[in-house]
Every structure is written in C-alpha cells, then in structure tokens.
Amino acid sequence: VRLALATAALILAGCSTDSFVGPLAYTRSERLAIDLRTEEGQPKSRLQARVNQVMDEVFGDAPNHMKVPPGSGLRDGGAWLAANAVLPSKERPGRVFYERAGTEGTTDLVFIQGGYGLYRLHCLHCHGLSGDGMGPTAPYLWPRPRDYRRGVFKFTSTNSMKPSRDDLRRIITHGVHGTSMPAFESLMSKSDIEQVIEYVIFLAARGETELALVNEAMSADDADADTTVTNELGLQLAQTVFENWKLADT
C-alpha cells in the first residue's frame, strides 16, 4: 500500500460529518484523581495538569486532532487514522488516498475515511470516545466492553497481552461468541476494518502511555511537576508502548 499523500510528522484531522457531531474530548484516566494525591489526600493538581498537557502534546488534545508519535509502527505513519492529514508544509488538511494492491501507477485510488470516523460510527457507543469501555450503551451490556486504555486484551494468539493485527481483524470481523461484541463483516468493508484496527491500536497505546505517566508521577512532589512529567518522558513512554505492539505482530 502506498499513500498518494506524504505523511511525515502527521497531525490528523477527523471527519466532520453529521454522524460525528458533539463535544470531542478524551476521558481522562481515573488514576489521575486516585493516585496523584498527597499523603493527606489532597490532589497533586500541578502533576495532574502536567500529565494532561504531556498527553495533549504527544497524542493530540482531542480525538479529531490527533498526533502520531514517531516510531509508532502504525500504517503509513498513522495516515489511516483519519480522513485528512495535515502536513507541516500545508495550512489545510488534504484528503488521504491509498492504492489497492496491484493497481500501482493507476488512478484507482481508495479514499481513507479514517479509523477515527469509522470508530465513532460503529464502536464509540460501546467502547467510548477514549476506548475506556464507557460508551453510552456500555451500562446495558454484560460483560462490559473492553477498556483499551489498559493495553490488556483477552482474546489473543500471542504470548503477550497485546493482540496481533490478525487477532483484532478476526474479532472485529467475526465478533466474540458469548459477549456483546458483534460481527462487523456485513457492516464494514475490509478496508474499513483495517482502518479501525489502526485506531484501536492508537487508542490503546494512548491510554497505556497515560497510565505510565501517572505511575512516573506518583512518587513526585507536586512542586516538581514541570521537571518530573516532561514531553520527552511522555514520548519515551509512548515509544516503549508502541514497541510492545510491534512485537505482537512479529
């Protein structure tokens, strides 16, 4: 697969159709409020704020304004996450297309709707905007939808807690018997499913990085927030998380 639009240093802008209206904000981890407290039980507000700021810097401040950390291993640098890619040399997002295998050099290009848009359409109502398993339908389901943010998945064929892309492809395509996870084979094309896979990996890596930042900040003094929770630390933790995802596909 080769993109018709270069995707280095991507910032991604999501779709803006009527299907995706409403406020767009990631749900912050409950660990921010629970773990980042003093011995007296007072919130470490500066550390909490720094974790949020670093997450915004590394992954983007909203689902429709994503940043893809370098070295993520996501397809084509993350261009499959959203319908439009904002390049450093451009002021406006450009539509992203890819070439079907075997059609290189032709004009037979497929528009990437984007894993973000497809996720909002098909998955958000159960798995939530942040992948926390707290979508509006979730309270009525048992077992509850998976919380991607922990980076732990049950149905895997790998030796690690991370599923391979084949695992995710199988689950999304065929569903999971005995759970509320339906089969999407008749609702999404193969291309759509591939884009959702990339977005699920992005959400899971984002959530796991957030938890890792909280763990780093737990023992720090609130006054040291700026030197303890840095953008460099956030990027380093994100790259470590993405490396574990890459291993699942080896």
Task: For the regions a language model picked out, list residue spans one by one.
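Domain-length accessory/inserted modules outside core catalytic folds
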Residues: 200-203, 210
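Electrostatic cytochrome c docking/interface patches
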Residues: 35-118, 213-250
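C-terminal motif of bacterial Sec signal peptides marking the signal peptidase cleavage site
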Residues: 12-14
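Sec-dependent signal peptide recognition
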Residues: 1-6
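Flanking scaffold residues of small Cys/His-coordinated metal-binding clusters
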Residues: 7, 118, 143
